[in-house]
């Protein structure tokens, strides 16, 4: 069967280092994990060069939204808030990440596959850099507001509503090789393909929270499955 096009995409930005980067920025991984991600790009490009496979590569910022695995920052915060558990924040919480709603990311990938010249690389970013501590506080505030105004959602709480506040935040030691900022420049996909993220972060985070509130059965099923690993 003929291969129409290979699209390789990932969410790890440590490939470049810690400055604002474009698609032409030299790859500069800082950890074994990010080196493995960089290697995947290099393999795709090597196959394209050697065997003339049609390909595109996308590199995106941190995704969030429905079906995000519960161990990741935003769903972990949501899960812990509902249970009244502490919210671990690395370092002082001042690490900065760019956040991209998953639906916007999917539309960007589709646009690359459908319209981009073969062999081109595109950064897909959310134009939404935030400190981790601000993400945590916004999530606390949003859940508290929903629970106060829509009482039917309180059935998913295993703690008192009064416990949903900033006292849940606890600062933990930052992990080795953790970059202070992942700064992505998605100008190329905006100017060449006309893509732009449609979801403001405050809208996206509320949609995400509501999805998790409405899909606790999925969350529990995933957590139960991972506990048997």
Question: Predicted segment positions?
Answer:
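A short, structure-level motif marking secondary-structure boundaries and short turns
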Residues: 28-30, 62-63, 170-172, 215
């Amino acid at each position: 069967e003929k291969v129409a096009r290979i699209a390789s995409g990932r969410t790890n930005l440590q490939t470049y280092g810690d400055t604002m980067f474009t698609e032409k920025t030299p790859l500069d991984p800082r950890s074994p994990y990010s080196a493995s991600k960089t290697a995947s790009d290099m393999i795709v490009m090597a196959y394209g060069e050697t065997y003339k496979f049609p390909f595109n590569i996308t590199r995106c910022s941190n995704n969030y939204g429905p079906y995000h695995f519960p161990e990741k920052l935003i769903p972990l915060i949501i899960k812990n808030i509902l249970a009244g558990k502490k919210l671990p924040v690395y370092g002082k919480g001042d690490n900065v990440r760019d956040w991209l709603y998953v639906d916007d990311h999917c539309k960007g990938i589709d646009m690359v596959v459908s319209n981009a010249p073969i062999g081109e690389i595109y950064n897909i970013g959310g134009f939404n850099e935030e400190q981790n501590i601000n993400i945590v506080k916004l999530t606390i505030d949003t859940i508290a507001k929903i629970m106060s105004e829509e009482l039917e959602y309180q059935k998913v709480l295993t703690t008192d509503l009064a416990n949903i506040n900033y006292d849940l935040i606890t600062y933990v030691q930052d992990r080795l090789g953790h970059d202070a900022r992942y700064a992505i420049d998605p100008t190329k996909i905006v100017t060449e393909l006309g893509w732009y993220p449609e979801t403001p972060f405050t809208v996206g985070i509320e949609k995400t929270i509501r999805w998790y509130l409405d899909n606790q059965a999925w969350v529990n099923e995933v957590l139960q499955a991972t506990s048997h690993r």
